[in-house]
Amino acid sequence: MATQEQKIIFRKMEEILRSYPKYQKRIEVEIENLKNPQIKKSCGPGGQGGNSYDYKSEVEQIEELKQRISNNISRYEEIIFRIDECLNIVQDHKDYSFIQLKYFDNKTYEEIADVLNISLKSTYGMRNRILEALEIHFKTQRLIEF
C-alpha cells in the first residue's frame, strides 16, 4: 500500500506525464507565433490609450514579443527534454507501455486492460511499478520536488 506521500508524488508525476503532449503542441503553436508575431492592441495601463510614458515602436514591440515567444519555446523544450531523459532511462521496463496508453493516448484503466489483455487489477499494478521506476529520475531531473 502506497503511503500518503507516495500518492501525492504519483499524482504530480501523472500530471507531468499528461502534460507532455500539451507541451509538444504548445511548442508547435509558439513556433507559428514566432513566424508571424501579432501585437495585440489593448487599452489601459501599458497599452494603447493608457497613461504610460513608456511608448515603444512597433518594431521594438515585435522584437520583445519574439523574445518572449523564444523564451517560452526554450522553457517547453527544457521540460520535454527532462521528461524524455526520464522516459529513456525506463524504456526497457516491462510496464513502459502503460505510459503511452494512459498518459499520452488518454486510455482508461479498463481500455488498457482490454488492449493488453490483462485484468483491471493488473493495470493498477503496472501504474505503480512504472511510476516507482520513474520517481527517482523525476526527482533527479527536478520535475518534482519533495
Where are these regions (language model features)?
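N-terminal interaction/assembly modules
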Residues: 1-89, 136, 140-146
